[in-house]
Every structure is written in C-alpha cells, then in structure tokens.
Amino acid sequence: MQLAQRLCELLMCRRKAAPVADYVLLQPSEDVELRELQAFLDENFKQLEITPADLRTFSRDTDVVNHLLKLLPLYRQCQSKCAFLKGYLSEGCLPHTRPAAEVECKKSQRILEALDILILKLVVGEFAMSEADSLEMLLDKFSTDQASLVEVQRVMGLVDMDCEKSAYMLEAGAAATVAPLTPPAVVQGESGVREDGETVAAVSAFACPSVSDSLIPEETGVTRPMMSLAHINTVSCPTVMRFDQRLLEEGDEEDEVTVMSPSPEPVQQQPPVEPVQQQPQGRGSHRRRYKESAPQETLPTNHEREILDLMRHSPDVPREAVMSPTMVTIPPPQIPFVGSARELRGVKKKKPTAAALLSSA
C-alpha cells in the first residue's frame, strides 16, 4: 500500500526531500591548485614572501598562474631526482657509475637553477612565456645526452694525449739542435810588419781538417795556408795567398797581378769503355777479340800545375820559358789476339791406343 502511494507521489511530483538528507558543496579545482602552488612557494621560495592574497591577485592574470602550474610538476621531478642522486653519490656509489651519476646530478641542479629564475621572473612580472613555447625546448638547453658526454670526454682525452706527445717531440728536437756540433777550424792571419820590413795582409780562410803541407817553398816569397791543391779540387773551401810586395818591380804594371787561388779546372771525363764481348769457349770456338778503347788523355798533376803558376808569377823567369801544360795523349795498348790454351801450349791431346795401354800395364 505504501509502495503504491509513493509511486503516485512520484508521478504527480509531490515527493518531498527527506529531512535526513545531507548535501556537500564541492570546491572548484582552481582553489586546490592555488593551495598547492602556495605550499610549493612557501617551501622553495620563502624569501619571496608570497601570501594567499598575492595568489588571488595572480589568479586574475591567468597566464602567470597557468605557467606556474606547468612548471610545478617539472620542478618537483627534478628536485626529487637531484636528491636521489646526491644520496646515491654519498652512500654506496659504485666506482664505474660515479661519473654518470655526477653528470646527471649536475644536469638536475642546472635545470633547477633555470626554473628558479623562470618562477622569479613570472612572479615579479618581468617575464612572460607564450603558449607556443615548449618546456621540452627549455630542457634541451640545459640537458645533454650521456653518450654525447662520453664522446666529448674521449675526444678530450685524445687531445691531451696528442699534446703530451707533441711536447715530447718538441723537447727531443730542441735537445738535438742544441747538441754541440764540431765547427770547422779557422786560420786567421794578423796584419802587421815583419822584422825584414815585409808587409803582410790580414787574411782568413777556412782550413779543412786532415790536409797535407803546402808544396810551395818559402824562398819564393809566396805563402799559403796549410792546404793542398788536391784537396781544393775536391772540397770547395776559399783560400787566400799572401805575397811580398818587394818582389814586384817598380813601374812594371803588367806584372802587377792579384794573386788569387787557382780555380779548379774542370776535369775531362773519359768516355766509358765498352764491355768486352766474350765468345763462347769450346773446341771450335773463335779467338777472343777486344775492342780498341778510346785514346786516354792524362791531365798534368797538381805538383806540375803549381810549379807552372809559380814560374809565371816569378820576375826572374821569362814568360817565354814558361810552357803551358799540354795534354799528353797515350796510345791505346796493343792487345794481342789470344787463342785457346791448347794452341798456346802447342800440344794436342791424343787419345791412348790399345797397344799403349797394354805396354803400360
């Protein structure tokens, strides 16, 4: 009966609310977010002294609040990550994982510092972040891939190794250049007047080691450093000759010549001798023949050249008596024809007969 009555009241909309019914008014989500933001600012930015009244003022500017609410979860995530890494580094960190943990901890600290600056700018009102800006782009500025850091560290190690090797090579090269070298001996003459009144000019020349004494006699008045002409032809070292001015006649300008070291004459190279073509030797071989070599020319020796130079410069010897060195032509040697060894001996080998073998036995 009560059920039918309730149904009629429901259809006729006559049902009244029960006196025991309790209704709860839910708060909007904005108030919850503002309280969470207030707790976050009180925890991390106490020095800013942001009050709830300030947050209500900020709530009028929806852009500032929205940006702060976007940064809030990211800031807490980086904060918890940094705290975990610091605890891991302080207690029980493995040696091979310490470099990676230190890098990640530094990255988290750098991101937290950047977020602190952003929050401060947003609260003060001197910074505005547009909706198009992405937080991922912001994180890319302060984060680096671990593989890239490892590659950079490896390259830096190679650069340091190359610097060490280069420094070692430079030091070794400098030590080699500073090593004492044996300088050539120097013969220096002193200018002055001898006891007999002879004027001597000051000369200096490079003296080559291991040279023989000069072949010029001292009676001629011509002196030369200790050096032989044979060594001059092979080694290009300058020499200066000293002479007595009294040997020259006064008024004879033709004989006044400057005595200088004789320049080495070019040596005439002999034509190469063709190799001997040997014929095959045998029983019926032909006689060996050698081709005639070119005529050999001999140059005057150093002693002869030096004597001729002295005779030219000496006033006591007439110039007509001095003969220039001539090339002496030596005829090629006459090589006789040579036959085989049997023909030279004049004995022919005979085969032993049977009768000779029996008689010898």
UniProtKB/Swiss-Prot annotation:
It comes from the Viruses. Residues 251-299 are annotated as: Disordered. A lipid is attached at residue 8 (S-palmitoyl cysteine). InterPro entries: Herpes_U44 (IPR007619). Keywords: Host cytoplasm, Host Golgi apparatus, Lipoprotein, Palmitate, Phosphoprotein, Virion, Virion tegument. Oligomerizes. Interacts with UL103; this interaction mediates UL103 incorporation to virions. Plays several roles during the time course of infection, including egress of virus particles from the perinuclear space and secondary envelopment of cytoplasmic capsids that bud into specific trans-Golgi network (TGN)-derived membranes. It comes from Human cytomegalovirus (strain AD169) (HHV-5). Phosphorylated. Palmitoylation is necessary for Golgi localization. Its main location: virion. Pfam families: Herpes_U44 (PF04533). Residues 266-281 have a biased composition (Low complexity). The keyword Phosphoprotein applies. GO terms for cellular component: host cell Golgi apparatus; viral tegument. Belongs to the herpesviridae UL51 family. It is found in: Virion tegument; Host cytoplasm; Host Golgi apparatus. This is Tegument protein UL51 homolog.
